[in-house]
Amino acid sequence: MRIGIISRTDKEEAIELDDTIIKYLFENNIEVELDSQLTKKLPQYSENSVDITKMNADIVLCVGGDGTVLHAQRYLSPKKIPILSINMGTVGFLTEVDPEDIFECLDKLLSYDFFIEERLQLDVLIDSQWHTVLNELVLMTSQPAKMLDLRVSVDEEIVDEVRADGLIISTPSGSTAYAMSAGGPIVDPRVDAAIIIPICPFKLNTRPKIVPADSIITVKFLKEGKKGVAVLDGIVNKEFDYLGEIKLKKSENSAYFVRFKKNFYNSVNNKLIVG
């Protein structure tokens, strides 16, 4: 088994945990690939340094919060490389393991006592370029105190004309992120669906909607003189303006996660209490 490690590098506790994990893997004769950003913090392992775009591990340990997972997934999901996420963030809805449980879980990993969970992603077309999101696309105004006027269609049928502070189009994985804070439902990741959630809509009858994942969702911008920003998984920002159009569809590339037990609802409930 070859194991990769991608980590947040702005937190000393994460770097210390990385060092401990690396030593454990070496002691167990495991081949290790380390993200080149990590080896800048741990130069003693520079011989194991690999650019994230060239990682070819069987499984990648992702040490950080949901942001670290989303960053890693952009490069790993096209290669179908599963992630084992270790929570060194705040709440961590995408993470599987707490630091105090890491060695128990590594023992299970090396014994192949785990399963792989597949999660839906969405492809987003903006300015003739396709992007993939695991959590969500967020559309928001770039002008403070202004609202967006949007037309939302599903398979060419107009669903709503939305006047709101913004709009979220989420996967089930993203339903516990910004979408939940905006009043959207928590959706089991086994559900093959996309969720459309307006942010502070002007009309009271503009409500969240769940649509089949294999639908084509189109968002069109209706008012001249207004500009906005499209934010993809909190990482990529794209500007848009009048008559701009965004399309979303189910991605052919799923995300893959290492899991040790099926406990989605228990995990969500516990993390909501902590959050």
Swiss-Prot record:
Keyword NAD found: yes
Quick one: which residues bind NAD(+)? Answer: 66-67, 71, 135-136, 146, 163, 165, 176-181
- Where's the active site on this chain? 66 (proton acceptor)
Alphabetical list of Pfam families matching this protein? NAD_kinase, NAD_kinase_C
Catalytic activity annotation:
NAD(+) + ATP = ADP + NADP(+) + H(+)
Q: Which cofactor does it need?
A: a divalent metal cation
The UniProt entry, under InterPro entries, shows: ATP-NAD_kinase_N, ATP-NAD_kinase_PpnK-typ_C, NAD/diacylglycerol_kinase_sf, NADK
Which keywords appear in this protein's UniProt record, sorted alphabetically?
Answer: ATP-binding, Cytoplasm, Kinase, NAD, NADP, Nucleotide-binding, Transferase
> For this UniProt entry, what's an example GO CC term?
cytoplasm
Location relative to the cell: Cytoplasm
Q: Which GO terms describe its biological process?
A: NAD metabolic process; NADP biosynthetic process
From what superkingdom does this record's organism come? Answer: Archaea
GO MF annotation: an example:
NAD+ kinase activity
In short, the EC number is: 2.7.1.23
Q: PANTHER family given for it? A: BIFUNCTIONAL NADP PHOSPHATASE_NAD KINASE (PTHR20275:SF43), NAD KINASE (PTHR20275)
User: What does the protein in this record do?
Assistant: Involved in the regulation of the intracellular balance of NAD and NADP, and is a key enzyme in the biosynthesis of NADP. Catalyzes specifically the phosphorylation on 2'-hydroxyl of the adenosine moiety of NAD to yield NADP.
Family per UniProt? Belongs to the NAD kinase family.
Query: What is the name of the protein in this document?
Result: NAD kinase
